[in-house]
Amino acid sequence: MVLIRVLANLLILQLSYAQKSSELVVGGDECNINEHRSLVAIFNSTEFFCSGTLINQEWVVTAAHCDSTNFKMKLGVHSKKVPNEDEQTRNPKEKFFCPNKKKDDVLDKDIMLIKLDSPVSNSEHIAPLSLPSSPPSVGSVCHIMGWGSITPIEKTLPDVPYCANIKLLDDAVCQPPYPELPATSRTLCAGIPEGGKDTCGGDSGGPLICNGQFQGIVFYGAHPCGQALKPGVYTKVFDYNDWIQSIIAGNTAATCPP
């Protein structure tokens, strides 16, 4: 079974396939409190259901399938139960999606750019991660993180984000397990061929950081998480650099690559 890696309560995403419950990092360890300063928690009245990445003081990048009617974003958070003194909460002021995204197709151009209702300040636990200067190379070591499930089948949500290292794999590795993905999808394939480490339900929208650069957005994967030869699929940020920069510069009519 394959599912979008987001919480099951986002019912609008349930189309012809089963939706993947929110994903957590499976096979990882608790993140160091200072190693996820750009990680954004996206939450509603009941739970953290997605993550995002702060790319400057006013803008966050996440997955389009993380969109919801009412949500807030928390920055500088580590533990859900023990707040950091520098945590900041923001609402979305504007949300941008690829104008050429196929309607009602959650597998197409899964990226959302959010302008915050007010800028955030850099602090001990908050700092942006810039857009990538070049695309990643196969074999790169990549870092995943999130508050998603830490068990592959039953949902087990941690109080703190979990982190793990995986590798960028050749796109061909992701084609057999996910034939439903468009052939032209601008995505990355990343994981551990033998399985054991993966993003999971609740990790959707979070970053894939390869060699220190923000290269991917948690998008799609298998359920149970962490299966052998079924790595995760990530939206390829580098392919959307021009669109993101155009929107930030004020060109709201900018179009994403096909």
UniProtKB/Swiss-Prot annotation:
GO biological process, one term: proteolysis
Tissue: Expressed by the venom gland.
Enzyme Commission no: 3.4.21.-
Residues of the active site: H65, D110, S204
Prosegment location in residue numbers: 19-24
SMART domains: Tryp_SPc
GO CC terms: extracellular region; secretory granule
Domain (Peptidase S1) ranges: 25-249
Bridged cysteine pairs (disulfide): C31-C163, C50-C66, C98-C256, C142-C210, C174-C189, C200-C225
Keywords: Disulfide bond, Glycoprotein, Hemostasis impairing toxin, Hydrolase, Protease, Secreted, Serine protease, Signal, Toxin, Zymogen
Signal peptide: 1-18
GO terms assigned for molecular function: serine-type endopeptidase activity; toxin activity
Glycan attachment positions: N44
Family listed: Belongs to the peptidase S1 family. Snake venom subfamily.
UniProt protein name: Snake venom serine protease catroxase-2
Source species: Crotalus atrox
